Amino acid sequence: MASEITYAEVKFKNESNSLHTYSESPAAPREKPIRDLRKPGSPSLLLTSLMLLLLLLAITFLVAFIIYFQKYSQLLEEKKAAKNIMHNELNCTKSVSPMEDKVWSCCPKDWRLFGSHCYLVPTVSSSASWNKSEENCSRMGAHLVVIQSQEEQDFITGILDTHAAYFIGLWDTGHRQWQWVDQTPYEESITFWHNGEPSSGNEKCATIIYRWKTGWGWNDISCSLKQKSVCQMKKINL
């Protein structure tokens, strides 16, 4: 009896392929976090804050400028009014220079005009110490005279009394360091000292005085002595 042979079909599932196929499937993408633009550190909020700050600064600057302009305009008006009030007490000379935009060069009454300055020799009763003389000039908007040229020296001496001495705006600050009251640099080449002067370290104020043999020149004396003086101020242009 022939034996029966039974055939069975056996199929094997390829697990590796299945696993491989599973592994190659794309993973689900992660969701990116959305930034909240309303948070304090966001660029838009910083930009807004910066613009507000710049606006406030601009407003502040504008207000300050308006206030400054108003005060400056007021000062000009007051200065103009003061000149108008003083005009009746001024002695004026018409300018002949076409380069000057102002027509008149003026000095207060009793003052003398020379160059760009006005000069005043106070009255006989006005003798005072050097400090007091400077104070008297200052109250008139002037200072003790500062001499810067031979021409100026000659003009000043031409209006002085040869029998008196006059304080000028030169004083010794210490160790023979001479200084002008208006801070003009002191230059040895533009000085008019008498021979042998200055002569004493204790005499710290300068006068202009006439000597019979040598004429007008400068002399140092004690600041506390009472002398006449010469005041100087810038001319007024109208």
Curated annotation (Swiss-Prot):
Keywords: Adaptive immunity, Calcium, Cell membrane, Disulfide bond, Glycoprotein, Immunity, Innate immunity, Lectin, Membrane, Metal-binding, Signal-anchor, Transmembrane, Transmembrane helix. GO terms for cellular component: membrane; plasma membrane. Residues 126-233 form the C-type lectin domain. The chain crosses the membrane at residues 49-69. It is found in: Cell membrane. A motif (ITIM motif) lies at residues 5-10. May interact with PTPN6 via its ITIM site. Contains 1 copy of a cytoplasmic motif that is referred to as the immunoreceptor tyrosine-based inhibitor motif (ITIM). This motif is involved in modulation of cellular responses. The phosphorylated ITIM motif can bind the SH2 domain of several SH2-containing phosphatases. This is C-type lectin domain family 4 member A.
